[in-house]
């Protein structure tokens, strides 16, 4: 029987009984089941007895073992107490040992200090004795003129002197030693010059060793610089004495300097520890010692060139210098990590330094240059057609000048002159717009658009309008190219000067600007030839403006900017003037006829028809000649305005959409013509005609009854013309026609709802009561 299930945590009596019966006999006789149950009960009783017996035995054993455990615990307690006492004793022994050791170490330290002082005193005595010995022998040594031996003696004296710092006559000994070094240098100088001049590696190495030992290396390098500088300066003197242009002289000088760089670096690598720095300093000193100096030569050459060519000449010289700088950069680049970058920066400044004054005033130079060139572009000619042709051709010339200026800025200032460039471009466009405006005024005078002869015959002449359309197309080309140029300018500025903008730059405060400068200074070393920046130090205000421009272009995108907003606005005004010119050239003939309306004597003079009858029907009257001419002229407008519709000219379309015509539609008026430029112009001319006609009618002093009917007939004719063209007659013209047609006795009733001032004026003109 398995009794282990009684120990399980999830023991269930019912489950156990069911399982026990399932394990019994399979046949279900009642007697068999009772027998099986009795057997189970008996087995359980036996198991209980065994468990009770086992528990009793275990309890007895535990009670017997208890005294032994207590005795063991007591013994362990006594042993722990003894161990504690022993540890206290050991701790006291250790403490005593530490105290004894500390005292011993202190004694040893003091003994060592005494020993060190005694050794130092002994060495000092030895060095003092050595100094005395060497001082006594030095004169004899100098008589030998053996530089190596003299150098060894001086080195020994120098070592001795280092041990005699605290002696009373230390300063006197220093002066004496320096005097001896000077004697050695004077003695060796002819040999040094000979060694450097002949490029003797072995001899030069000896002198490098000697002068290094006596701490006179800078003086030795001075001899080296002087020897080779003399040769290079002589080359420059020879070039200057020849009758050569400055760019040729510069080419010769730079060729000599670059050759010296290559030969001297090869030689100096065998002699000096820092050969590249030595040769770099040689070039720096040579460029600074040129006679005549490069700044003076540049100044004289630019002055000889005159205002027209000064910037061109300057760029020619700069190209030569930039070519030399590129050659040096390529020579330095493979060994850039071996260079003293501070000296390389000085070399870059020495190469580009002569151009710095001109770079700082680049904006003024560029402005003067552009104004001279744009002044040479002819815009006015004797004939109108030639003038129009020149205006059209001037667009390409204008943006050619502007693009050339951008190229010069990138080449001469590496983008740092952007602020000056923008100012120069603004002046260029201002000057051009002024010339263009003067040309338009000249065309107006030649077309006689401002002074209309009072009695001139009415004749159609569309030449002025056709020329005006060409001028409008020119304005459109100006606007289009201005937009393209502005985009190219923004991209060019970012590509050339964008490298100067630090990622940490913030335009919100000057502190942010300063932080960005400091950040740049702490950044890893870059190529000084590519990082040359004359503007940041010499004109920080302009540099700050440049950073603002670059930041704006970078943040807002090069397509969202206002670099040439002033110039763009000026060109838009120019387009507006061209629109006015074209409008006036069309409207001139109409205006000429309408100005006669108020001055016609027939309005208040009784004619033959006046005496016949006032009851003749209105259709018996015909429009007068002035209004017939106007009507026929307006009817011919669609044909002559057709180029606006049929001509595929993107520049013309751009200009027409950018321009605004006079006499815009009244508020609330339907504007179907806005979708078509020709209809737009036709509507503007029609509104101008009706308004001018109304103004002329209202200036008539008085009209007779017959003239009233005639005037109403003329107005009806013009209204019919407008209807025929699909144009809406103006309210004022319709109101005047209504008031003129009203019978005198019905005038007051008819005028109700019409403008009172208009009704009163017409009533006075007709002589009716109102």
From Swiss-Prot:
Keywords: Golgi apparatus, Membrane, Protein transport, Transport. It is found in: Golgi apparatus membrane. Its main location: Golgi. InterPro entries: COG7. It is a peripheral membrane protein. One of its GO terms (biological process) is retrograde transport, vesicle recycling within Golgi. It holds the Pfam family COG7. Belongs to the COG7 family. This is Conserved oligomeric Golgi complex subunit 7. It comes from Rattus norvegicus (Rat). The gene is Cog7.
